[in-house]
Amino acid sequence: MHSRDLIEQYKTYVQDWRRYFHKHPELSNEEFETTKTLAKELESMGVEVHVDTERGTGLIGIIHGAKPGKAIALRADIDALPVQEHNTFDFKSDVDGKMHACGHDGHMAILLGAAKMLTAMKDRIEGDVYLAFQPAEETGAGAPDFMKFDNWFEKIDAIFGGHVWIDLPAGLISVEEGPRMAASSKIIILVKGKQGHGAQPHQAIDAVVVASAIVMNLQTVVSRNVSALDSLVLTIGNIHSGSEWNVIPGEAQMGGTIRFFEPAQEDHYVESIRRVVEHTALAYGATAELIYEKKVPPTINDAAASELAERVVIDTLGKEKLSKMRKVMPGEDFAWYLQEKPGCFAFIGIQNPEVGATFDHHNNRFTMDDSVLSAASAVYAEYAIAWLKEHK
């Protein structure tokens, strides 16, 4: 039996689970009921289940093959976002202010589908397949924390995962080698001026004016400090300052992010930002401090793993389903796994205007064409089987 023969059989199964999870979202590090539901379903398949009882969120399932061998992990993230859903379909979120707006509901459903297929084909598995249902991806720290649970990560030899992607037409899959998603870091800028009366600005140092100048000058970091051949995104997402209409605020705080693909350039990017922040503030008689927090490194696919994934997609779904897609600037904590183990991270197309699947990730109208998810389940299952067979 081959997974391609099970795609139609499990199509509704995978769709139903995606819609169940969509209706019952839980935020990062709060995925308690999600974890219980996953554990119960996996146990019903005869999968060995290890729940992170210390945290109460996240679990590892293990499928032992008919023959001994190495171990590979298939990963799905399980957390939702603090977004108020504006969709109106019958499986929209039942929880105010919480929504699966990034597609992790689809990831869980895909991996459950893969588990169904793998348990039906144990005779083809030459080793162990670990099913990693990881919490808190949206925090950036979910993977590093989860890797420590039960030493599971030390027991595997390779890993595979993916992300449903709204920019890719439904049914297509991209598994190219090299950088696929950007490194993500958080920046906080603290501005200190001098508070004063709104009618006497000459006796104050206006933190709002200083912060505004910093935002404008930071645009030159990308346009004048970085090669046009490199990719850098620098975004300021919030500014907080003042509380009264007639008071010049003496302090301001800004938060933002930078995204890039070249780790060797990170120090240069940070120092360029720091120089602009500090010297712009000095020009206005103020001071400013940059706080830099690394979140995730770039997600970089191993060449051999990607080559195998391409063969698996073609063999399982047909050559017409293998797509090429440019790397993207959002970050993904799957990158932490790829820092230590060979693996591949796939993009799974879910865009379909006929079902309203056109809104971007993190949008309150986000949805997907979930009719294609069982095909992704087949790719996950066949990748695990193929990798174990080629690495006896």
Question: Each predicted region: which residue ranges?
Answer:
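A structural signal for isolated positions on well-ordered beta-strands in alpha/beta enzyme cores
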Residues: 50, 130-132, 289
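Hydrophobic beta-strand positions in extracellular immunoglobulin-like domains
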Residues: 63, 191-193, 258
